[in-house]
């Protein structure tokens, strides 16, 4: 029993005394003083500088977060409409001007009419391509499949006339301008090939008609070249090689 009592006294034995309680209180007071001193130091830190209200108003963001300020001019449909209206037409961007095409056609159809050099100096291949296709189509309707001859003679003839004009003129001329003028002047030959659909041109009438058409084409081409390149007094020198070129087209058309 004595051992059991000693065990109980050992089990419930504690070193806690009043002195320890006072020491704990002193420690808590020290902690409180330490916390208070830290709080006082935090309150004594320097405050940020004063910023005027005008500066805040000028640099502040007028919109809201996640909601940008709307721009009525940017999102208005009228701005898109105005941008489309200011764009040039598609035909003008492609270089197709029906007014100039019609003026060049009238210049070719009337050899006595003076040519406008500013218009004829343009590189317009819309009319020449149409006239070449029309010549091939009329020859096809007349029973002559000569598309290869038409395109081949056109390309070789343009190269020859281009080289000749660059040697004769001081300003020089582009290949596109030569092809444009020779292509437009092919229109009378289209008229001759259209006549070959309805009656035969192998005879005196056909020969005379072919000579008239050759002179018509070469006269129109030489007139346009002299006007566009300022080659006054050299029209006959230019008309001779043009007559040789259009004579080949006449041979294909008649025979």
UniProtKB/Swiss-Prot annotation:
- Which residues are connected by disulfide bridges in this protein? none
Q: Where are the transmembrane segments?
A: 125-145, 147-167, 181-201, 205-225, 235-255
Q: Which residues lie on this side of the membrane: Cytoplasmic?
A: 1-124, 168-180, 226-234
Which topology term describes how it sits in the membrane?
A: Multi-pass membrane protein
Q: Which organism is it from?
A: Bos taurus
Q: Which Pfam families match?
A: Yip1
Location of the protein in the cell: Endoplasmic reticulum membrane; Golgi apparatus, cis-Golgi network membrane; Golgi apparatus, trans-Golgi network membrane
Task: Output the Gene Ontology cellular-component terms.
Answer: cis-Golgi network; endoplasmic reticulum membrane; endoplasmic reticulum-Golgi intermediate compartment; trans-Golgi network
Q: Tell me its family.
A: Belongs to the YIP1 family.
Q: Does the keyword Transmembrane helix apply?
A: yes
Q: Name one GO biological process term.
A: vesicle fusion with Golgi apparatus
Domain of life of the source: Eukaryota
Q: What is its main location?
A: endoplasmic reticulum
Residue numbers on the Lumenal membrane side: 146, 202-204
In Swiss-Prot or TrEMBL terms, this protein is called Protein YIPF7
Record's keyword terms, sorted: Endoplasmic reticulum, Golgi apparatus, Membrane, Transmembrane, Transmembrane helix
């Amino acid at each position: 029993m004595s051992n059991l009592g000693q065990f109980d006294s050992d089990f419930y034995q504690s070193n806690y005394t009043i002195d320890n309680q006072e020491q704990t209180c002193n420690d808590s007071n020290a902690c409180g003083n330490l916390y208070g001193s830290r709080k006082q130091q935090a309150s004594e830190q320097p405050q940020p500088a004063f910023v005027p209200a005008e500066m805040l108003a000028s640099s502040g963001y007028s919109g809201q977060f996640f909601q940008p300020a709307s721009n009525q001019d940017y999102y208005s449909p009228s701005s898109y409409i105005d941008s489309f209206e200011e764009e040039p037409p598609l035909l003008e961007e492609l270089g197709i001007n029906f007014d100039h095409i019609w003026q060049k056609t009238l210049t070719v159809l009337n050899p006595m009419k003076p040519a406008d050099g500013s218009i004829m100096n343009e590189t317009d291949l819309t009319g020449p391509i149409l006239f070449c296709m029309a010549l091939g189509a009329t020859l096809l309707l007349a029973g002559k499949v000569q598309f290869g001859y038409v395109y081949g003679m056109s390309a070789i003839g343009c190269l020859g006339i281009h080289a000749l004009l660059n040697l004769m003129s001081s300003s020089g001329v582009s290949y596109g301008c030569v092809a444009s003028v020779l292509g437009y002047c092919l229109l009378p030959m289209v008229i001759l090939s259209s006549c070959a659909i309805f009656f035969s041109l192998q005879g005196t009438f056909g020969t005379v008609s072919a000579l008239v058409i050759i002179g018509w084409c070469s006269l129109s081409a030489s007139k346009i070249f002299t006007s566009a390149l300022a080659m006054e007094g050299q029209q006959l020198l230019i008309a001779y090689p043009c007559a040789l070129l259009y004579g080949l087209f006449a041979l294909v058309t008649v025979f």
